[in-house]
A protein has these predicted regions:
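N-terminal exported-region signature
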Residues: 208-241
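Extracytoplasmic/lumenal domain signature
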Residues: 1-209
Length: 241
């Protein structure tokens, strides 16, 4: 109805200059946003502070969210040159933060660059380096890639030419750069562009609560294609995937 929600506005000591990201995990929704007071905040749906991560400088880019085997992980960069990764409770992931040596200028995105089942984190700094890290914080092979001009913006990753490997697209101060990573990879269902999707919703729903649906011991039914009020076993048998 346009009214300010109970518990809001949330007040920090400086200004927010980025789009917030909403995370849903374990039946809870919370808001994440970095602030010019050097702090990354997570805010519960009732307006209370969930956690706060202090960094060494301002935060001017939105977070990226990655589903891991232990639930969602929240990645964000700071102008202190570090790329951070935390759990929904604000605890640092093993191997993080990573010191890149230069200001983080774009939101991180994700893809399985070498198709080994473990995604990589792609980011850029205010200098001329394109950075890719493995989930444990170690650098991807042949990274960083150094360019002649500084980057300006967030990367996106996709298999543009349908050859099975991944291209990284990112803007610079004078051009659009495309980097063809020669390893076979996949973007899968990963947050592979700014704010997660083409609609730029900045919303992430964790898949850890998913369940398997079965009918008469037949799993994985296509419920979209299942007609209503059909009980005959013959007709039902044609709809499982």
């Amino acid at each position: 109805n346009g009214q300010i929600a109970d518990g809001f506005p949330f007040t920090a000591s400086s200004d927010f200059r980025l789009a917030p990201v909403i995370v849903e995990a374990n039946g809870e929704k919370f808001i994440t946003a970095g602030n010019r007071d050097n702090t990354f905040y997570a805010i519960n749906s009732d307006g209370s502070q969930r956690f706060a991560i202090e960094t060494g400088d301002d935060i001017s880019t939105s977070a990226g969210i990655l589903e891991t085997e232990n639930g969602p992980a929240i990645f964000f960069g700071s102008e202190d040159g570090k790329l951070y990764a935390v759990t929904p409770d604000g605890n640092a992931l093993p191997g993080w933060p990573v010191d890149t040596g230069s200001e983080i200028v774009g939101s991180p995105v994700f893809a399985d660059m070498d198709n080994n089942g473990s995604p990589e984190i792609i980011s850029a700094v205010s200098g001329t380096d394109l950075l890719i890290f493995r989930l444990d914080g170690s650098p991807y092979s042949d990274i960083p890639i150094d360019f002649e001009v500084p980057f300006a913006g967030s990367p996106a990753v996709h298999d543009l030419d349908n050859d099975g490997d991944i291209e990284v697209l990112i803007g610079s101060t004078n051009s659009l750069i495309t980097v063809d990573i020669k390893d076979i990879g996949s973007t899968g269902e990963y947050w592979n562009m700014y704010r997660g999707n083409l609609q730029r919703t900045g919303y992430f729903g964790s898949g850890t609560d998913a369940i398997t649906i079965s009918v008469e011991n037949i799993p994985d039914w296509n419920l979209v294609g299942l007609p209503l009020n059909v009980s005959d076993p013959f007709h039902l048998s044609i709809f499982p995937d």
